[in-house]
């Protein structure tokens, strides 16, 4: 009987910005990770776990994603990511990524268009209340509810104020997230 790969995996987690700088700008990047794949494999790792590399304003170390379909430019390009995948697989390494689907950045297109009225359907991708419904606190301090003047309501943010929580009760949001996950 063959066990699932993840049961016996040796996982090496990488925070890309501090791992290996390939171009001398002081910020680790995808090319830097590629340069160290042989080293990672020599440690016995079978899986690389990447912390967020998506486009982000970096309020919360990349966990405030503004575009699930783009790489943060300081970390590289989509071509660099494709190269990382190819090179890792050639060495027998799997690559997994942080899946941040509790919230987005307030700079994400969904939040921007939903709050500006440009695409009102996106407003319901987030959790809104006209009045603060409770006294929940944010992990980052203060209230977990932030008032948005454009909408005239409070949105939930369990983390930073610039990380509005997603409304998983909305089937359209779930479809968007599932589409991104299978991309």
Give residue ranges: language-model regions:
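Acidic/aromatic-lined carbohydrate-recognition and catalytic surfaces
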Residues: 1-178, 182
């Amino acid at each position: 009987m063959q066990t699932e790969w993840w049961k016996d995996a040796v996982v090496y987690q990488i925070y890309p910005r501090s791992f290996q700088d390939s171009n001398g700008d002081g910020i680790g990047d995808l090319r830097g990770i590629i340069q160290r794949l042989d080293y990672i494999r020599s440690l016995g790792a079978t899986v690389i776990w990447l912390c967020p590399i998506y486009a982000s304003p970096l309020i919360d170390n990349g966990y405030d994603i503004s575009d699930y379909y783009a790489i943060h430019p300081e970390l590289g390009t989509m071509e660099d990511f494709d190269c990382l995948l190819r090179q890792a697989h050639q060495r027998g390494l799997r690559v997994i990524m942080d899946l941040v689907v509790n919230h987005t950045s307030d700079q994400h297109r969904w939040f921007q268009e939903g709050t500006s009225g440009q695409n009102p359907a996106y407003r319901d991708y987030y959790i809104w209340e006209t009045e603060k419904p409770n006294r929940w606190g944010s992990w980052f301090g203060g209230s977990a509810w932030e008032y948005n003047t454009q909408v005239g309501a409070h949105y939930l943010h369990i983390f930073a104020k610039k990380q509005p929580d997603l409304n998983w009760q909305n089937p359209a949001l779930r479809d968007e997230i599932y589409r991104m996950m299978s991309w």
